[in-house]
From Swiss-Prot:
GO terms for biological process: glucosinolate biosynthetic process; response to insect. GO terms for molecular function: heme binding; iron ion binding; oxidoreductase activity, acting on paired donors, with incorporation or reduction of molecular oxygen, NAD(P)H as one donor, and incorporation of one atom of oxygen. This is Cytochrome P450 83A1. It is found in: Endoplasmic reticulum membrane.
Length: 502
């Protein structure tokens, strides 16, 4: 079906190209890249599977800055720490906009959110609000008990499976953990994990995430938007939005109900509705703005932490010496403390574990291709022209393997590199940018880190793991599932064994 659609796109685009093409008045010296076909550009050369590795392969051939074309759009990919710094620091303002994306526009209530909003005065106001209120250290700390409570529930499930020598699905457990935490933090709602409301929430979430990761023909072939309709993509987008909007509106209505029993800790939607009532911004802050911002929190919060822990455990299965070293540190510290559960406060006393978290985010950044930026004005990078309107991707996966920064073995999973070198993910070390950098850096970085540390550390404390059914580490599938966050394409399943906790 996809091949047929591509064929129709090509035919329709060729006809419309000759009807509407205008002569270019300016020639640019674009970065090198593969030769494009007429009209459709490099569309047929792209790969869906493991796009970060695919673009890294192109970078080896064409260099750390390359360009390609899809339809009417010029695309640029950055794959080195040096050029990432040029883009994200030196020329940050000029690359602070977002490119066209029909799904992003529709799902985010006309880009009223933080992540997908154009670079406008409203964006700057809403980002400042997010940094100072939604994601401040104080706000993140208020939900510490929620994250720890849900992590305990997750460990209890694994304990029961270990008693029966059953296989556990780490991917599924982590998604359940993040979904439960996010519902409590964002909405003040504690759902039964197997109940209908949680199933409804997950269905809505997956639909929204799916639309955000889709490619729309109309974004690249302006005269072929009808193909989004013919393929059913437009209808699917509207259906997902309808479910999403109905759910969030119900939560908003509950928040406004004066008879409602408020959660013990103010939820994020309570905070946002307070801002809606106060109207502190120069731009109007509507209910749709509330919905869009809460959507950012839900989508980012559920996806990234789960993917990170799964990738971490995957690499630990392939590097048993790292696993043993991490387990030894966590277990020795907790034995000395006399506790059987790692809290967020304990993590700061576990230097090797903190290095392990960083190495996990380095070797498999969960958003390996940072959310695309758009060039606002004509500029140059590395001597090449970058025209206004160009879409620019930073391949964080390739940047974190830049041999100039990480040495000759960047594919080796080695947490020690973060004990030997002072590098952090706060956006100022451009060889390590899992949360991005600059004006578009993820404002929820602190919350994202907190979401993954406690479950990750307690897996190391409480259990030994082995692969099921005689699998060997080399048998583990390392492919990624395409989307906003790159999950493993196949769930990670392990056999837990209880550890004697002194």
């Amino acid at each position: 079906m996809e091949d047929i659609i591509i064929g129709v796109v090509a035919l329709a685009a060729v006809l419309l190209f000759f009807l509407y093409q205008k002569p270019k008045t300016k020639r640019y010296k674009l970065p090198p890249g593969p030769s494009p076909l007429p009209v459709i550009g490099n569309l047929l050369q792209l790969q869906k599977l493991n796009p970060q590795r695919f673009f890294a392969g192109w970078a080896k051939k064409y260099g750390p800055i390359l360009s390609y074309r899809i339809g009417s759009r010029t695309m640029v990919v950055i794959s080195s720490a040096e050029l990432a710094k040029e883009l994200l620091k030196t020329q940050d303002v000029n690359f602070a906009d977002r490119p066209p994306h029909r799904g992003h526009e529709f799902i985010s209530y006309g880009r009223r959110d933080m992540a997908l909003n154009h670079y406008t005065p409203y964006y700057r106001e809403i980002r400042k609000m997010g940094m100072n209120h939604l994601f401040s250290p104080t706000r993140v700390a208020t939900f510490k008990h929620v994250r720890e409570e849900e992590a305990r529930r997750m460990m209890d499930k694994i304990n029961k499976a270990a008693d029966k020598s059953e296989v556990v699905d780490i991917s599924e457990l982590m998604l359940t953990f993040t979904n439960s935490v996010v519902c409590r933090q964002a909405f003040g709602k504690k759902y039964n994990e197997d109940g209908e409301e949680m199933k409804r929430f997950i269905k809505i979430l997956y639909g929204t995430q799916s639309v955000l990761g889709k490619i729309f023909f109309s974004d690249f072939f302006p005269y072929c938007g009808f193909l989004d309709d013919l393929s059913g993509l437009t209808a699917y987008m509207k259906e997902c939005f309808e479910r999403q909007d109905t759910y969030i509106q119900e939560v908003v209505n509950e928040t406004l109900d004066p008879k409602r029993v408020k959660p013990e800790t103010e939820s994020m939607i309570d905070l946002l509705m307070g801002i809606y009532k106060e109207q502190p911004f120069a731009s109007e802050f509507t209910v749709d703005n509330v919905k869009a911002v809460i959507l950012d929190i839900v989508v980012a919060g559920t996806d990234t932490a789960a993917a990170a822990v799964v990738w971490g455990m995957t690499y630990l299965m392939k590097y048993p010496q790292v696993l043993k070293k991490a387990q030894a540190e966590v277990r020795e510290y907790m034995k000395e403390k006399g506790s059987t559960f790692v809290t967020e406060d304990d993590v700061k006393n576990l230097p090797y574990f903190r290095a392990l978290v960083k190495e996990t985010l380095r070797i498999e950044p969960v958003i390996p291709l940072l959310i695309p930026r758009a060039c606002i004005q004509d500029t140059k990078i590395a001597g090449y022209d970058i025209p206004a309107g160009t879409t620019v991707n930073v391949n964080a996966w390739a940047v974190s393997r830049d041999e100039k920064e990480w040495g000759p073995n960047p594919d080796e999973f080695r947490p020690e590199r973060f004990l030997e070198k002072e590098v952090d993910f706060k956006g100022t070390d451009y060889e390590f940018i899992p949360f991005g950098s600059g004006r578009r850096m993820c404002p929820g970085m602190r919350l994202g880190a907190a979401m993954l540390e406690v479950p990750y550390a307690n897996l190391l404390l409480s259990f030994n793991f082995k692969l099921p059914n005689g699998m060997k580490p080399d048998d583990i599938n390392m492919d990624v599932m395409t989307g906003l966050a790159m999950h493993k394409s196949q769930h990670l399943k392990l056999v837990p064994e209880k550890v004697n906790k002194y």
